[in-house]
Amino acid sequence: MVFSSLIFMCIFLPIVLIAYNLSKNLTYKNTVLIIASLFFYAWGEPIWVVLLIFSAFVDYINGRIIDKYYARAGATIALVSSLVINLGFLAMFKYSGFFIENINTFLHTSIPNPNFKLPIGISFYTFQTLSYTIDMYRGKTRVQKSFLGFLAYVSMFPQLVAGPIVRYSTVASELNSRRVTADDFAYGVKRFTAGMCKKVMLANSSGAVASMVLDSTRLTVASSWLGIIMYTFQIYFDFSGYSDMAIGLGRMLGFHFGENFEYPYISRSITEFWRRWHISLSTFFRDYVYIPLGGNRYHAIRNIFIVWLLTGLWHGASWNFIFWGLFYGVLLFIEKTLFKKKLQKIPAPICYIYTMFFVILGWALFYFTDLNALWTFIKSAFGVGTALYDLTAVSTFCTNAWLIAVCVIASTPIPTIIHKNFCKKSKVFAAISEPILVIVGLGVCFVLLVGQTYNPFLYFRF
């Protein structure tokens, strides 16, 4: 089940919200949340509910042990147990096939490939439960004594299958005591609607164009860049839209999740881009891998490449994701060692062009899982053995020029700034604009969803 589906919006969500708000106390609310979340998760593949509950139980027990034996050997054993079991499951389901396939290729062996199916959302909820046990071990959060409360945290459907990665410490107090105000609920509806509009109106439309162009067997320079630019819009509006919907749903239920995107396409450097893109993942690797390895103080270059190798692998068990991670590792290494503060002295437009050129090129590594197809695209993009443009590329651009313009504007703070300025000038506008925008936005999304067949969330596969 996906947020941008009629069954979710018309049946699942209304039933959950009614049952949740009719619940008289926190125990009932958590129970409703757990039942709804497990049903939501089981909609995709029921068997993986068992793994989800088992993972939650393992780290609930490990958390209790760490609390009991804090700063003693027992706590260390529990932390190691958490790391081994969680990362072991992740490695088995996500990476075993990739490593066996490459061992067979390079060593000419014939080890059977288990071909495990990837449990939905395992990369996200694994990091969430690890954040709990690691923070418990560091003394940065308090133990959750109720398994019901902990399972509610791990299985919470708004962010279960595609993030953002919500650390336990972020919602710990709300698991034990929360209240949904009218303002919270209204903000949640507004935020959910904004995310839905991003997904249905912009991501799906951009994705359809990107697939049509990039999957063509005859790429020109113009069509290569047009296709990957449309994919650049698709992945941003798809993932940031999902994050907006998750944040909105969380607010409707009384939870305050952190922001996951801060207009990354206005960044003036790659470093700034990663402060704005998928914030929950980049800060996770910063706090739980980069800083423990020594951060900027010891072996900074080594630490950068380790983190970005892991970041690439987190996104997928494929060479293109490894190269994508190392691609950013190299760029960040160059910025930290060679550019340092020089980028601040360069005119902003040049910095924007520099940043977006490499970001867009990076998405090619993300899009093409087949390395031969990737190499074909790179040659086409830089004019090796292909024409500059053809009539199909020109026609596709002209047909979708309006979409490109809307995507460019929507990926900046401009619409928000304009709306806030109008709200300051007119109290009447401020009072009626948001309800009207929500109603119109949801109405348009409903109409589009009825007729659309292209509706994937890209980050579901991670």
Q: What do the PLM-derived regions correspond to, one by one?
A:
Residues M1-R461:
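Membrane-embedded transmembrane alpha-helical bundles that form the catalytic cores
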